[in-house]
């Protein structure tokens, strides 16, 4: 057969539309585990729960460390960042790009436990933000003795 399969362009368009949708408007997600996430822009995250802490990992390509703001209070973590525009010279022009233009992105995450925000730590390396939030004593599971 000569040329492209006609389904290639259909699937390519569907793929782009599917992944572009969460990048444009404000979204709200509630997981089956009760975690609520709202936000805007492209910021994939993972939430990992340990016995003593909660770890949130956010993928932030194209973001500088100085352009990230973190706030935690109670059982909520907020991540805000600003993605810089592509740097091109006057003699260049963008003819196609899937990389978002300059944008402000954020996530507000209702965590599965109350955290000690004053003991939280974060690091940003190779476009990946890792935030570790120790659980508050009242959120740590404790065994109950039966008499």
From Swiss-Prot:
Alphabetized GO MF terms: identical protein binding; protein folding chaperone; unfolded protein binding
Pfam families: HSP20 (PF00011)
InterPro entries: A-crystallin/Hsp20_dom (IPR002068), HSP20-like_chaperone (IPR008978)
Localization terms from the record: Cytoplasm
GO biological process: protein complex oligomerization; protein folding; protein stabilization; response to heat; response to hydrogen peroxide; response to salt stress
Domain sHSP: start-end pairs: 36-147
A single GO cellular-component term on record: cytoplasm
Coiled coil: none
Record keywords: Chaperone, Cytoplasm, Stress response
Family statement drawn from the similarity comment of this UniProt entry: Belongs to the small heat shock protein (HSP20) family.
Known partners and oligomeric status: Homooligomer of 24 subunits. Forms a spherical shape.
Function as written in the Swiss-Prot or TrEMBL entry: Chaperone that confers thermal protection to other proteins.
UniProt protein name: Small heat shock protein HSP16.5
Taxonomic lineage: Archaea, Methanobacteriati, Methanobacteriota, Methanomada group, Methanococci
